[in-house]
């Protein structure tokens, strides 16, 4: 089976490509022109350069593929409002979906985000039945991902789009070249995390999400969403787990919500005045003390998503960052 993977050089995309190769599939990786694709070096794949916002280039890349796994996304959170976020997270999805229908591709696995559903407390974590509630934070990343998901589900109902949607939570793993979640690990390792907030989130191994995406080519139902979450930890627990896994001291100070919000307000103001991304914006300050917990029951039961122990995912991420020069030696 030949499968087109968008965002193939990103953290999740790099895991998806390797998972597909392990299963014996042919992979065509669609990457942006001129982009560093070092995470794909040495892999037996077909690389195609193309602009996802150009429908003809997308169709050309999709020719002769039986399935598409769309992992590319703009995860920018500053500025919190930016048309470029919508271009990647909504316009591109519309172009891909149209090409899937025109070329009669068998399966379109779209990677969304768990935040398209309302989270819950640990005792009652969010599920695929929950409404979208994160619009209150004013982040185009979350709003655009939810809007794209709604569009795809409408297209499935009205036009028979063969789409299955995967909704990952916060991912740890190798190939985190930005780094994204790896920044949290680097900060704890270097002792740069002064404290933690009262909220929490769901952490998952990127390799598990990749396995679920690959499984979705054969398993699961069209027009369904699957939350690919993992372990639900408050921030104190998460930082202690990272510190224990790496053998360093955990941050011990719990920062009050009012102080976090004040820091976020100052950060947003500084960001607007300086044009530089702040350490903490007001929307992210509000997110940081929310309980963002999710259930992975549906993805585990229907897609057979594995459940890697979180320390293993943390170590995998840290070791990759270390091997690639991101870790400051103590």
Describe every region a protein language model picked out.
Residues 34-41, 45-91, 99:
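NAD(P)H-binding glycine-rich loop region in Rossmannoid oxidoreductase-like domains
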Residues 158-165, 169-203:
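NAD(P)-dependent short-chain dehydrogenase/reductase
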Residues 77, 114-124, 171-178:
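Conserved catalytic-site region of short-chain dehydrogenase/reductase
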Residues 212-279, 296, 301, 309-330:
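Mid/C-terminal beta-alpha module of Rossmann-like enzyme folds, strongest
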Residues 147, 179-180, 197-217, 223-224:
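Substrate-positioning beta->alpha
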Residues 88, 94-140:
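Conserved Rossmann-fold NAD(P)-dependent oxidoreductase catalytic core, especially the SDR/UDP-sugar
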Residues 3-23:
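N-terminal Rossmann NAD(P)H-binding glycine-rich loop of SDR-like oxidoreductase domains
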Residues 137-164:
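Active-site Tyr-X1-5-Lys
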